[in-house]
Amino acid sequence: MTERTIDTSCARVEEAVLAALRAYDAATRAGDIEGQVDFFADSWRSSSGTTKADLREYLRKQVDGPTDREKRFVLDDAEVVFDGDIAAVDPVALRSPTGGGFFEFRMTRESDGAWRCVSVAGSRRADRLAENTRELRERILSDQARPGYHFVMPEGVAMPFDPNGAIYWKGRYHLFYIFQDTRLGKRSDHWGHVSSSDLFHWHHHPTGLLEGMYSGNCFLNREGVPTICYHQHGLGNAMAVALDNDLNEWKKLDSSPITPQTREGDEHHGKYRSWDPFGWREGETCYAIFGGKRPAVAKSPELDGEWKYAGDLFAHGVEGVAINEDVSCPDLFELGGKHVLLCISHRLGCRYYVGEWRDEQFHPESHARMSWVDNSFFAPESLVDDRGRRIMWAWILDEPLFGARTKHGWSGTLSLPRVLSLGDDGLLRMDVPEEIEALRYGEVRKGPFVVAADEEVPMDGVAGNSLELLVEMEGAEASHVGVKVRASPDGQEETSIFYDAEAKLLKVDTSRSGPDDTPQAVEAAPFELKPGKRLKLRVFVDKSVVEVFANGRQAIARRIYPSRPDSIGVRVFSAAGDARVHSLKAWKITPSNPY
C-alpha cells in the first residue's frame, strides 16, 4: 500500500471510517464471519499474535458461543483523529454481558478504498487528556508573567476576557467571563463560570452558557431567580434564566431578542443599536440599558413581554466628556445616596458617571476615568454582597506583543476585586477587600526613616514578584515621593510608583519595567495631597501586574514584563527634597490560583 495523507477537511472521510466500524459491529452481532474478517487489514496482528489468516478459524470456533452476538461496539463518544494515513477512533465502547471496556481502533484506507483496522488497543483518550493537561499546567506554572492571585483565564487565550454576570447568590460570589473556543464546530464566544466564598479561591463550574455570548449582567427577576441580560451575537440583546441554584443550567428565553422592533414613523426608529445591555427590575417593570454612542433605555412589564424604548439613557451631557462618547459594558447601581454608572468607551477605557436615575433617565452630575493612557483597564463588572459591599472587577489587557498564543499559551487577567464607596466629592473610593489578608505571609516592617533628596533606599528583606506593600510617607519639599518595585540591583529594570506633587498626579512609570518591546507608558491619574497630608500607598505586585491604591482615593493598574530573574527588589525614593517614611509594611502573597 502506498503511503498517502488524508484530506481531513472532508467530513465524508470521517463518516466512512465510522461506517466501517458500524459495519463491523453489525457483522459481530449477526455472526457474519466474513464481514468480521474483512474489517481487518492484511497487516493486522492481535496482542497475542493472531493474524488475519488465523482469524477466520478462530471466529468459527467462537460464533456459536452464547454471548458473542450480544456484543455491541458503541461509537457515541468516539472521535476520529487523523495522523498521516492512519485514522484513530477513540473511545469505542465494547458492551457485553460478560464485561466490556473502551478501545482505540486504528484504521487505514487500503487500495480498494475500504477502511480497515490495523490495530486495537485500550483507549488512550484519558491518558492523552491527562498528558495534555499536565503539559499545559507545567508550562503555565513556569511562566514568570502569569499572575498568582489575580484571577486568570484557566487555560488558553481569551480575547475579549470581559467579566460578566457577577452576582452574590446563596452565600457565594459568582462570576462569569467571556472566552472563545471551537467546541460547536466554529469559533464562538461562551461564558465561563466560577464561584468563590472568599473572592480569591475560585471553583470552576461547567460551561452552561454557550455560543455567541457577549457582554451582560445578572439580576433577580420578579420571582427572585437569577436572570442574565446579555448580547447574543447575531441576534441582539437577550435574556436567560437560571434553572438551578448552582447557576450551572440556564434557559435562553424563546422571546429573545428583547431589542424593540420599530418602524418608519416611530419616535425611536433608527436611533439606537442593540449593544452591551444591562438589565434590572424596578417595581413591576423590567429595564435594560442598551449601549452605544447613543445609549438607550428599553422596558417591558415582563421579561418575556414586548420591549419598547423609553428613550435616551442620558437626560443631558456633563462636563468633561462628549454626549456621544460610547457607553459599553454598562453597570448601573445605587451607592452613597447617588447612582453610579460604570462603563467603558472604546476611546477612553474604563470610566464612570455619578448622578441620579429618575424618570427613566440617568441625570449625570460628574464623570471620571479609571484608565488614562492606553485603555488597558477595561470592561468593569460589579455585584453587591450580603454585607452591602459593592465589589467590582475589570479586565486588565495584555500588551499587544505579549505572544499569548505563540509564546505563553494563555491570555486573560482580571483586576483584583475592588470595594467601591462614594466620597463627599462625588468621586469613587476604592480598596481591596479584607479577604486578601488571608493570603499574606512573611510580614516585614520598616521605619520610621528619612530618604534624602534625590536618593533611594533599598528595602533589605523585602523582595519578590508576589507582594503587598503598605507605605506611609510624606515629603513637603519633594517633587516626587514613592516606591520602586520589580527593581533589578543595577536599576536597569524597575517600575516606579509615586506622587508627582507639582502636577498633582499619581503615576506609575513603566518606561524601565522591561525590555524595549514591552510597554513603556507612564500612567498618570488625577490625585492631590493637601498640605500636611501623608501619602498612603497600597501596592500589589503579582508577576506581570501592578495595582496601586493611593489614600483610598485613586487607583491604577498596569501590566509589566520584567525579563530578569533578579528584578525583585523594592526601593523607596524621593526627588528634589527629603521624604520621611513613617512606616513600610510588606507581605509576600501566596498564590490563590491553582496554576
Question: Where are these predicted regions, by residue range?
Answer:
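Surface loop/turn signatures of beta-propeller and other carbohydrate-active proteins
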Residues: 128-165, 183-186, 200-220, 247-281, ...
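Short beta-strand edge/turn micro-motifs at domain boundaries
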Residues: 1-6, 10, 88-90, 100-127
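Hydrophobic core segments of beta-strands in well-ordered, beta-rich domains
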Residues: 161-182, 205-207, 215-241, 258, ...
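Surface-exposed, charged secondary-structure patches
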Residues: 16-18, 56-104
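Beta-rich accessory regions
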Residues: 357-375, 381-595
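Short, low-complexity N-terminal intrinsically disordered segments enriched in polar/charged residues
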Residues: 1-42, 53-57, 74, 85
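A short gly/proline-enriched turn/hairpin at secondary-structure junctions
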Residues: 39-53, 66-69
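Conserved Ser/Thr-centered positions that define the repeating blades of beta-propeller domains
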Residues: 196, 240-244, 297-302, 355, ...
